[in-house]
C-alpha cells in the first residue's frame, strides 16, 4: 500500500470521526458485537493461521489468543455503557453552587501496531478497547505473521466499514508511511528500538502513545510454596508460546 492510499484511509476516518457517529454508545456496542461474531465465525481460520505462522496448537491458540480475545470483547460489551456515562466530581469553593462532572470522550483516529508473537490477542484486545471508547482504528499487523494478518484483514472487512476500522498490511515502508500521518493515539507493541522510533515520530504532533515493550519479569517463590508445583508452573509460564511472551518469567526470587 502506497503513501497516498494510507493518507486517504486516515483522511476518510478523520472525516467519519468528525460526524460524531462513534460517540453513540449503542453504535459502539454494535461494533463490538460485530467483532465478537466475526471472531467466532473465523475461529478455525484464526487457529489455522496461528499454526501456519507460529506452529501453535489449536488448544494453545484458543487459550492464549481466541478465548482471551473473546473474553475481553465480552467485557467491553458488558461495561461500555457504564464507562461512557458522565461522572460526578466534587466542586471547588468557587463552583460550590454548580454540579461538576467529567465526561470521557474518544481520542479520534487511532493506530494499533501489533507484534508477531500474539498477532490476534495483541490486536483484538486493543481494538475492542478503542471501539468501546468511540475511536476509529487503523491496524498495522506484523509482516512476520502474514497468515494471521490476512485473517485479521478478512475479519475487519466483514465486520466494519473501512471508515471505522481498516487493516493495512505490509512491512517497513507501510510502517514509515503510517508514522508520517498525524494520529490522535498510537498503541504499539514490540521492541524497545522500534518503540523509541514510534515515540519520536509521535512527538512531532504531541500524539499520546501507549508502548508495550516487554521488560524483565521476576517470579517470587516464598517459603510456603510447594516446590514441585511451583517448578511446573514456572516452566509452563516460561515456555508458553515457545518463550515468546513479554511477561514470561525471566528470573527467580526464592525465599
Predicted regions and their residues:
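Residue-level signal for inorganic ion chemistry
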Residues: 28, 73, 134, 165, ...
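Short gly/ser/thr-rich secondary-structure transition/capping motifs
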Residues: 89-97, 167-170, 233-234
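Conserved small-residue-rich beta-alpha loop and adjacent elements
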Residues: 91-160, 206, 228
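A structured beta-alpha segment of the ubiquitous adenosine-cofactor-binding alpha/beta core
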Residues: 99-101, 167-184
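ALDH superfamily catalytic-core signature
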Residues: 160, 193-255
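A glycine-rich helix N-cap at a beta->alpha junction
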Residues: 161-167
